[in-house]
Design a protein with these regions (language model features):
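Glycine-centered flexibility motif
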Residues: 25-27, 43, 62, 141, ...
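C-terminal active-site "lid" helix and adjoining low-complexity regulatory extension at the edge
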Residues: 152-168, 178-182, 191-237
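Membrane-targeting and insertion segments and their boundary/processing signals
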Residues: 14, 143-147, 200-204
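A long amphipathic alpha-helix within ATP-dependent nucleotide-binding catalytic cores
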Residues: 50, 100-195
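Hydrophobic faces of well-ordered beta-strands that scaffold small-molecule active sites
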Residues: 17, 54, 185-187, 204
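Active-site nucleotide/adenylate-binding loops and adjacent lid/helix of ATP-dependent enzymes
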Residues: 1-118, 166-171
Length: 237
């Protein structure tokens, strides 16, 4: 009831609505350009399915990067691209998703480097913001994004940026990890321009159970063998 009363405060404002304590991008809806009361209310309903407490956050512009910190050092950085399909001018979004999901790197249950793309309520809401639906036929060469959040767990693609991000942001990620008292964690950071150390940035989340294997098998880029860093931390090697 309290959430519904507050809806009018957020109409047409760039916001993120998400459960307080979930992982893997579950229950999250993002409205980078703002939206109407109906979509906000539906986003609340989805989020409350997963937690008794729901957060409303300001949407931060930029691209999201996952910094994997192990024992006070950054051992991998991924840019995660939201679930998407590339049009051919013939197939619908539904058909393109089915085709992309045939990639052997994609599976279900977080046992593969990438997850299969889902076509559910969250994806339908995000496509609606683009005046599209699952039966839309993208133009040849047109990329259509199905979600705003870029989690691998919701069908996103992964690109390794470990060697490309300025040391300044690696140091910030380590400081965030230390502040949280974590020896292993994933720091999610938004950067407007990853190549500029003076760019705007924001830490949007710290994860205490980060997926390590996604850095070992990126969709694009260098494979990072980070399991050995965990073994070193545990003094097993």
């Amino acid at each position: 009831a309290e959430a519904k009363i507050s809806i009018n405060n957020y109409i047409e404002k760039p916001i993120v609505i998400k459960p307080k304590s979930t992982n893997f991008g579950t229950g999250i809806n993002i409205f980078p350009e703002g939206t109407n009361a109906e979509d906000i209310e539906r986003a609340f309903e989805i989020a409350f399915k997963f937690d008794k407490t729901v957060l409303i956050e300001e949407f931060i512009k930029g691209k999201e990067y996952r910094f994997l910190v192990i024992d006070d050092q950054v051992v991998g950085i991924l840019h995660r691209v939201p679930a998407n399909v590339l049009g051919d001018g013939v197939k619908t979004i539904r058909e393109l998703v089915e085709l992309k999901n045939q990639n052997p790197l994609r599976g279900k249950g977080y046992v593969t480097p990438l997850e299969k793309i889902n076509l559910g309520e969250n994806e339908a809401i995000f496509l609606k913001q683009q005046n599209k639906n699952f039966d839309y036929v993208p133009l040849a060469g047109e990329t259509v994004y199905l979600r705003e959040n870029s989690n691998i767990s919701t069908g996103g693609d992964s690109i390794d940026y470990t060697d490309d991000i300025p040391q300044k942001f690696k140091d910030i990620a380590v400081k965030a990890s230390k502040a949280a008292g974590a020896k292993i964690c994933g720091v999610d950071m938004m950067l407007e321009d990853y190549s500029d150390e003076n760019t705007n940035y924001a830490i949007i989340e710290i994860n205490f159970n980060p997926a390590i294997h996604i850095h070992s098998y990126p969709f694009i880029g260098t494979e990072r063998k980070n399991a050995v860093e965990v073994l070193k931390l545990l003094e097993l090697v």
